[in-house]
Amino acid sequence: MARIAGINIPDHKHAVIALTAIYGIGKTRSQAILAEVGIAEDVKISELNDEQIDILRDGVAKYTVEGDLRREVSMNIKRLMDLGCYRGLRHRRSLPLRGQRTKTNARTRKGPRKPIKK
């Protein structure tokens, strides 16, 4: 297994799909990276030599991925919560942020029902 950005990339998959195992890289960005470094999308990771994997590693390193991206997202959410703005309050209360109704739906975000204490 090739190791790129601290993640073991699956060998048996095509390069364009295998790169999506990295947090922050979807199919479109994967296609862009492969086009940039000059590797075909339909080649499997196991067929790449070490030199091509190093080139691919450099291509991925240009983007914010994995731990750095996760940290950035959590810091953005924490910043909203510290500001006390509407979105920050909704994050703090674990409610939907984008105007969805909460009277009957939003069970995923709110969690399981809490029984009413008498």
Swiss-Prot record:
PROSITE patterns recorded: RIBOSOMAL_S13_1 (PS00646), RIBOSOMAL_S13_2 (PS50159)
Chain spans, region Disordered: 94-118
GO molecular function: rRNA binding; structural constituent of ribosome; tRNA binding
Transmembrane segments: none
Pfam families the record matches: Ribosomal_S13
Keywords: Ribonucleoprotein, Ribosomal protein, RNA-binding, rRNA-binding, tRNA-binding
InterPro entries the record matches: Rbsml_uS13_C (IPR027437), Ribosomal_uS13 (IPR001892), Ribosomal_uS13-like_H2TH (IPR010979), Ribosomal_uS13_bac-type (IPR019980), Ribosomal_uS13_CS (IPR018269)
GO cellular component annotations of the record: cytosol; small ribosomal subunit
GO biological process: translation
Self-association state and partner proteins as the record states: Part of the 30S ribosomal subunit. Forms a loose heterodimer with protein S19. Forms two bridges to the 50S subunit in the 70S ribosome.
Assigned protein family: Belongs to the universal ribosomal protein uS13 family.
Task of the protein: Located at the top of the head of the 30S subunit, it contacts several helices of the 16S rRNA. In the 70S ribosome it contacts the 23S rRNA (bridge B1a) and protein L5 of the 50S subunit (bridge B1b), connecting the 2 subunits; these bridges are implicated in subunit movement. Contacts the tRNAs in the A and P-sites.
PANTHER family associated with the record: 30S RIBOSOMAL PROTEIN S13/40S RIBOSOMAL PROTEIN S18 (PTHR10871), SMALL RIBOSOMAL SUBUNIT PROTEIN US13M (PTHR10871:SF1)
Protein name: Small ribosomal subunit protein uS13
Originating gene: rpsM
